[in-house]
């Protein structure tokens, strides 16, 4: 089997590192570096386990894209710290001690020569979805703690799997179409697309998506298993001769405007204009700029984490 392309959900991983690694871990100058250490250590573990020859850290260049807000104004509204005028991305509410650590992580990635991928006006989910969907050569492993990305699982044209970090990296679960179908009771032949439709119907308070009132995850899964797709569910709800319960029909038809708008909000983009920070996504076996990498590691107090990353890279074939 070919070595995989590993796509890391940057924000998901450094948020989890920030909250999962003690804040007592600091740089020599006293600045917290718990997220930096946790992120680099997690990346080393993923490289050791998955043995990729290509890797990209995917970024939110716009964590709350305007096209999604235009469709569902409540989308992530509760996480806005400071609205920005003139179409600029709103400022996200982020712990004060995390923001400077994100800059440190990106400095280290740049010095090491590890690719960072982003697309103006799009979230990291869209970057991950675009890169996974357009891959035609290597199997893809998406690493994230965001369940929304289960919609990208696929078997063709290349296997796309999601390493879900919901309970942490040590207890991560690998999902493909079969696992998504089994876990959520969805049609196996379109498990990824069906998961997006499940999320749309169920809603997601953490993203400000209301869902269809009175339709929870179990009901949504039952509807998808019975009818096959969201379009077919709505066709059945619109059919007076349907066997669908009257109360459920009423709920779905009352929410038809939301369902239509939310479809584009919930589904990740697969055509985002993604660019890389490096010429290719080839995973470097040694730091591109060893002097700068060493200087940053010393300044941030993460020499041991960089050593663990290098040890993981040393196990890969040249």
Swiss-Prot record:
Residues 194-278 form the 5'-3' exonuclease domain. Pfam families: 5_3_exonuc, 5_3_exonuc_N. Its EC number is 3.1.11.-. It is an enzyme of class 3 (hydrolase). GO terms for biological process: DNA replication, Okazaki fragment processing. It comes from the Bacteria. Transmembrane segments: none annotated. 5'-3' exonuclease acting preferentially on double-stranded DNA. This is 5'-3' exonuclease.
């Amino acid at each position: 089997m070919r070595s995989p392309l590993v796509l890391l959900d940057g924000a998901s991983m450094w948020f989890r590192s920030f909250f999962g690694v003690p804040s007592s871990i600091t740089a020599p100058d006293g600045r917290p570096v718990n997220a930096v250490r946790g992120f680099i250590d997690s990346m080393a573990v993923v490289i050791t386990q998955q043995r990729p020859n290509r890797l990209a850290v995917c970024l939110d260049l716009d964590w709350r894209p305007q096209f999604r807000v235009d469709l569902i104004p409540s989308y992530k509204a509760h996480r806005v710290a400071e609205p920005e005028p003139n179409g600029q991305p709103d400022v996200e509410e982020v712990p004060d001690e995390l923001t400077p650590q994100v800059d440190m992580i990106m400095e280290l990635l740049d010095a090491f020569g590890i690719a960072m991928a982003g697309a103006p006006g799009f979230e990291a989910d869209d970057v991950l979805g675009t890169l996974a969907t357009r891959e035609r050569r290597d199997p893809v492993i998406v690493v994230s703690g965001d369940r929304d990305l289960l919609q990208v699982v696929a078997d063709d044209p290349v296997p796309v799997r999601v390493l879900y970090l919901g309970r942490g990296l040590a207890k991560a679960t690998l999902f493909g179409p079969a696992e998504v179908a089994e876990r959520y009771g969805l049609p196996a032949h379109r498990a990824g697309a069906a998961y997006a439709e499940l999320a749309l119907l169920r809603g997601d308070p953490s993203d400000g998506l209301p869902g269809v009132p009175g339709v929870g995850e179990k009901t949504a899964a039952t509807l998808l298993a019975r009818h096959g797709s969201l379009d077919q569910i709505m066709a059945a709800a619109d059919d007076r001769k349907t066997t669908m319960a009257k109360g459920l029909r009423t709920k779905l038809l009352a929410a038809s405007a939301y369902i239509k708008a939310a479809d584009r909000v919930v589904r990740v983009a697969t055509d985002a204009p993604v660019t890389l920070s490096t010429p290719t996504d080839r995973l470097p076996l040694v730091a591109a700029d060893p002097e700068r990498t060493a200087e940053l590691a010393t300044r941030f107090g993460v020499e041991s984490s960089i050593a663990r990353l290098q040890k993981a890279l040393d196990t890969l074939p040249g």
